[in-house]
């Protein structure tokens, strides 16, 4: 028996990337105007390109979500709504939003416009999902920090809400007060009120060195008052990386997410190359199709994403 097939949602930083995403199996793309969608660089979408993209997507029977997940300050609110009006007129399948004020304004100005809650809203529990459901949000893009079990519990608690999950791409280390440093060094989570202000410690960098058995140890950062508590700093031919998370790659969990009834599997990467968009769409398309038809996961897909 075939399973419900989740939507494969790919990033689009350009019309070319959008077309390749669809050609290689994406069901939908997400894109936005640079100043409204947290992607100022490597984003060629203006109003004309947005209109063309939405038109092409619908002609193919695909979906196009317009990203509007910026958190505007007072002096940007009217400008945001002004620039959003023509986008709504283009007929995107939904707006991706994060700010409660923007959600309220969209409801006032554009009643009936579907809205998906951005990952920027940091939705990490089923109670928050129910809250946003009551506000008229049609889909929740869950926080990228959630594990499989947590996603499953949310699905069970709120079975009638569309859930979207990031399965591939870059992971942010911190976002406005949601720092990871304290949790990394001494397991005191700032998001639970236990921050130790690790950002204010005095650090020293210890150079890479060869240990007693001939293995190279990476550059590490050490707090002067806490000897032995080390944070690695990776280096390669391109430079040094501090607080650089490894990318998310959850292709091996596609079957589990499909069985849970997750509605959409999302790939990060609106600033990535068209090749990246095409390749990731191709691999995740195969993983979804295999999961839906009951085929065992093919481990070779892991290496195709290296």
Predicted regions and their residues:
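As written
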Residues: 136-137
């Amino acid at each position: 028996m075939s399973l419900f097939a989740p939507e494969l949602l790919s990033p689009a930083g350009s019309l070319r990337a959008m077309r390749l995403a669809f050609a290689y199996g994406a069901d939908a793309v997400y894109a936005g105007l640079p100043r409204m969608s947290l992607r100022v660089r490597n984003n060629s979408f203006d109003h004309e390109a947005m209109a063309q993209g939405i038109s092409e997507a619908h002609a193919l029977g695909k979906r196009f979500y317009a990203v509007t997940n910026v958190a505007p300050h007072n002096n940007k609110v009217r400008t945001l709504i002004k620039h959003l009006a023509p986008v709504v007129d283009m007929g995107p399948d939904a707006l991706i939003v994060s700010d409660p004020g923007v959600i309220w304004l969209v409801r006032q100005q554009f009643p009936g416009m579907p809205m998906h809650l951005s990952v920027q809203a940091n939705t990490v529990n089923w109670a928050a999902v129910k809250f946003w459901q009551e506000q008229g949000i049609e889909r929740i893009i869950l926080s990228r920090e959630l594990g499989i079990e947590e996603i499953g519990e949310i699905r069970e608690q709120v079975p009638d809400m569309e859930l979207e999950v990031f399965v591939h791409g870059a992971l942010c280390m911190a976002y406005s007060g949601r720092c990871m440093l304290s949790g990394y060094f001494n397991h005191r989570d700032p998001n639970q009120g236990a921050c130790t202000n690790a950002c204010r410690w005095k650090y020293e960098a210890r150079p890479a060195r060869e240990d007693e058995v001939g293995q190279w140890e990476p550059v590490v950062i050490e707090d002067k008052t806490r000897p032995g508590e080390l944070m690695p700093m990776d280096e390669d031919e391109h430079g040094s990386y501090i607080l650089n998370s490894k990318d998310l790659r959850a292709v091996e969990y596609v079957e589990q997410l499909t069985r849970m009834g997750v509605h959409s599997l999302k790939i990060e990467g609106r600033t990535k190359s068209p090749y990246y968009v095409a390749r990731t769409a191709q691999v995740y398309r195969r993983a979804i199709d295999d999961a839906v038809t009951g085929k065992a996961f093919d481990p070779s897909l892991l290496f195709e994403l290296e």
